């Protein structure tokens, strides 16, 4: 999940902050101190995060493009200049441009906006931007909500009392609301000083940049791992009173399945699984991603001497061409698999399925899967030439049938004309006539288009009166019968208006075999 740090470099950030016993600080210095702390934490505990830095006043500038080199980011902090007035809309437009150019519109991102709470003056101020929100067209729309999934964290170099006194807090809260409620505002508790700034950025780290550590288990084997990026809580829409579901810190492998059987399933998110090496005393050595070559070699030497289940599992899945089903929580599963990063390098990945008993319909209920040895005969065949999957659904899925689409008038007109063409060819086209008639009837009932049924009924009655003298007598009977059935369905009552009811041909006999002879 990439991060964009957005630093306010307007003149208001140069306002002095009295600090007892030391030289005078500016709010800009407090912001630099907090960001330095954040970058140091990420360099140690969140090394895989791609981070960019944007500065803004009335305009915006990309100081550092997306990188994992936190030394470059810290150097950029020391080269920041002071500019003119604040324009938050310009900054947010810059963020949108930077993220979409690098990552597109589907990758979730985190935005850390560091400002002093001053909203600017005149045109370009946040007050003006929000006041004209409903007067814009698509060409100059406000950048929030972003076109990509995002969380907006606003770090204010001011305390709560100062923001409330200037009404700035209300406008900043509007930004979070415009971002679909995704994000949070952080303020300094107490007086403005380095210690309180550290405390504020510490809260941000706890919320967004704490690494997710877990224990990967399979039977008696286990391994400490880091899951990156950290999995987000999931809220299911189907529940009446939904609660966010979080994955367990104990990830238990419950079985293995062929890659061909799992296919390419829909997933909520994908994560890298990294082994955490521990020394003999149980202290954490790390994931092997060290800052310099000397530390990296030392960490790799230590990690290489210790057997690790995570490494064993990764290699086995890669060689055998299988995935591991892993229990994430109650009625919630995911899969572990090897994904090639290049010709020589691959990574152990974890994908999260939708919570539920049957996340992948072609596998059936996950809890009912079992080992091959439980089956009476090998479901894959003696020569491994067949598969028990996919399971055939009990009911036909909607996509297995021809769906009736009436988005345009021409689609409805075509379906009605098809019925009329078959009506003129009765009784030869009796089966086709009733098939098309029932298809139109079901679609009309599904859409609540009861007037259509009455209209088609009137058309069939008219066709009946226009039949030529040479027409087969059965045609008139079938048309009258179909028209009457549609008229009953158009009332919406009785069994004739039921969706599952089908109109069947009227049974007639013109052979004379059943007539009485004198």
Curated annotation (Swiss-Prot):
Q: Which Pfam families match?
A: IntS14_b-barrel, IntS14_C, VWA_2
Q: Which CDD domains match?
A: vWFA
Q: Which InterPro entries match?
A: INTS14, IntS14_b-barrel, IntS14_C, VWF_A, vWFA_dom_sf
Quick one: signal sequence residues?
none
User: Which key words tag this protein in UniProt?
Assistant: Magnesium, Metal-binding, Nucleus
One GO CC annotation? integrator complex
Domain VWFA: from-to ranges? 2-204
**Origin, by domain of life?**
Eukaryota
Cell location = Nucleus
One GO BP: RNA polymerase II transcription initiation surveillance
Q: Does the keyword RNA-binding apply?
A: no
Which residues bind Mg(2+) per the record?
A: 10, 12, 86
Protein task: Component of the integrator complex, a multiprotein complex that terminates RNA polymerase II (Pol II) transcription in the promoter-proximal region of genes.
Q: Write out the similarity annotation.
A: Belongs to the Integrator subunit 14 family.
User: Can you name this protein?
Assistant: Integrator complex subunit 14
What gene, per UniProt, encodes this protein? ints14
């Amino acid at each position: 999940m990439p991060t964009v740090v957005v630093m306010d470099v307007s003149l208001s950030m140069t306002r002095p902050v009295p600090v007892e016993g030391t030289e005078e600080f500016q709010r800009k210095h407090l912001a630099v101190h907090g960001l330095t702390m954040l970058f140091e934490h990420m360099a140690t505990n969140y090394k895989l995060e791609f981070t960019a830095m944007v500065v803004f006043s009335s305009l915006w500038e990309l100081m550092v493009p997306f990188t994992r080199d936190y030394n470059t980011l810290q150097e950029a902090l020391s080269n920041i200049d002071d500019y003119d007035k604040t324009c938050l809309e310009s900054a947010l437009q810059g963020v949108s441009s930077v993220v979409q150019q690098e990552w597109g519109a589907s990758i979730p991102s985190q935005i850390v906006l560091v400002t002093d709470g001053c909203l600017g003056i005149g045109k370009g101020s946040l007050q003006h931007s929000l006041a004209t929100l409903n007067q814009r067209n698509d060409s100059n729309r406000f950048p929030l909500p972003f076109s990509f999934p995002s969380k907006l964290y606003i770090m204010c170099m001011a305390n709560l009392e100062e923001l409330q006194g200037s009404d700035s807090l209300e406008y900043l809260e509007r930004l979070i609301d415009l971002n679909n409620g995704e994000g949070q505002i952080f303020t300094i508790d107490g007086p403005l000083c380095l210690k309180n700034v550290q405390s504020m950025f510490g809260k941000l780290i706890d919320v967004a940049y704490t690494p997710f550590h877990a224990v990967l288990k399979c039977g008696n084997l286990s391994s400490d791992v880091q899951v990156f990026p950290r999995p987000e809580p999931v809220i299911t829409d189907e529940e009446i009173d939904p609660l966010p579901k979080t994955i367990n810190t104990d990830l238990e492998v419950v079985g293995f399945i062929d890659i061909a059987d799992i296919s390419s399933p829909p997933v909520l998110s994908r994560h890298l699984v990294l082994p955490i090496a521990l020394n003999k005393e149980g202290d954490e050595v790390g994931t092997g991603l060290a800052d310099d070559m000397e530390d990296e070699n030392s960490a790799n030497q230590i990690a290489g001497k210790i057997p690790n289940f995570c490494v064993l599992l990764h290699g086995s899945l890669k060689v055998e061409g299988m995935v591991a089903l892993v229990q994430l929580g109650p009625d919630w599963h995911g899969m572990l698999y090897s994904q090639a990063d290049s010709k020589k390098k691959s990574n152990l990945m974890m994908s999260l399925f939708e919570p539920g008993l049957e996340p992948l319909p072609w596998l059936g209920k996950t809890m009912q899967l079992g080992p091959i040895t439980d089956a009476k005969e090998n479901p894959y065949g003696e020569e491994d030439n067949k598969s028990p999957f996919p399971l055939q659904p009990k009911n036909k899925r909607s996509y297995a049938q021809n769906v009736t689409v009436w988005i345009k008038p021409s689609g409805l007109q075509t379906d009605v004309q098809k019925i009329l063409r078959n009506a003129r060819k009765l009784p030869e086209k009796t089966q086709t006539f009733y098939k098309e008639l029932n298809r139109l009837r079901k679609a009309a009932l599904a859409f609540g288009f009861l007037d259509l049924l009455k209209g088609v009924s009137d058309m069939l009655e008219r066709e009946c009166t226009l039949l030529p003298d040479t027409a087969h007598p059965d045609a008139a009977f079938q048309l009258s019968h179909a028209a009457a059935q549609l008229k009953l369905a158009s009332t919406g009552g009785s069994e004739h208006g039921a969706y599952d009811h089908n109109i069947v041909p009227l049974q007639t006999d013109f052979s004379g075999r059943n007539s009485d002879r004198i």
